[in-house]
């Protein structure tokens, strides 16, 4: 029996440990196409050593002309299950607003800014093994932020 070259072993090891983000969505599962008036947006997360210490925040929103007030849109991100597979995907059906604070803006200047949708369901479990699939109405952008837990744990006081 011939010894296996080190380069072959290294190549096989790298292929086996490649992140799921290398695969296209169709290679993972038959997620439905976006319905008319919606887009399907996908997030591929890198693997982390301790994924339980991380959360994924979905920031769906629109780029709008805003003044000095704080702007926000309203909506709820709902979790659905891909039948026969058990994989989750998320859907934002309606986006309301915008709503704004009512501060006086003396200069009256407007700038373009990303205005997020605020509501329930936007903080998700971190899972690099599967893509995060989000269906949103046309014109809505999906951005995301990864949160991590601090290693510094505090003790509560008994009072």
Swiss-Prot record:
CDD domains, alphabetically? Ecotin
Signal peptide location: 1-22
**Coiled-coil stretches, from where to where?**
none
InterPro entries attached to this UniProt entry: Ecotin_C, Ecotin_sf, Prot_inh_ecotin, Prot_inh_ecotin_gammaproteobac
Pfam families cross-referenced by the UniProt entry: Ecotin
Q: Keywords on this record?
A: Disulfide bond, Periplasm, Protease inhibitor, Serine protease inhibitor, Signal
| Superkingdom of origin organism | Bacteria
* Major location (coarse): periplasm
Q: Output a single Gene Ontology CC term carried by this record.
A: periplasmic space
Q: Localized where? A: Periplasm
**One function term, GO molecular function aspect:** serine-type endopeptidase inhibitor activity
User: Which positions form S-S bridges?
Assistant: 68-105
Q: Note the site residues: Reactive bond.
A: 102-103
Assembly and oligomerization: Homodimer.
Q: Which family does it belong to?
A: Belongs to the protease inhibitor I11 (ecotin) family.
**PANTHER family assigned to the protein according to its UniProt record, in alphabetical order:** ECOTIN, PTHR35890
Q: What does this protein do?
A: General inhibitor of family S1 serine proteases.
Record-given protein name: Ecotin
């Amino acid at each position: 029996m011939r010894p296996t070259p080190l380069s072959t072993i290294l190549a096989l090891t790298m292929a086996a440990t490649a992140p799921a983000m290398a695969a296209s969505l169709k290679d993972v599962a038959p997620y439905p196409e976006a319905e008319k008036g919606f887009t399907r947006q996908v997030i591929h997360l890198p693997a982390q050593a301790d994924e339980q210490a991380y959360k994924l925040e979905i920031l769906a929103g629109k780029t709008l002309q805003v003044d000095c007030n704080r702007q926000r849109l309203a909506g709820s991100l709902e979790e659905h299950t891909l039948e026969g597979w058990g994989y989750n995907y998320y859907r934002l059906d309606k986006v309301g607003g915008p709503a704004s604070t009512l501060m006086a803006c003396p200069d009256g200047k407007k700038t373009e800014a990303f205005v997020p949708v605020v509501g329930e369901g936007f903080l998700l479990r971190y899972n690099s093994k599967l893509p995060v699939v989000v269906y949103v109405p046309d014109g809505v952008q999906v951005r995301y932020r990864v949160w991590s837990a601090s290693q510094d744990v505090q003790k509560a006081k008994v009072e």
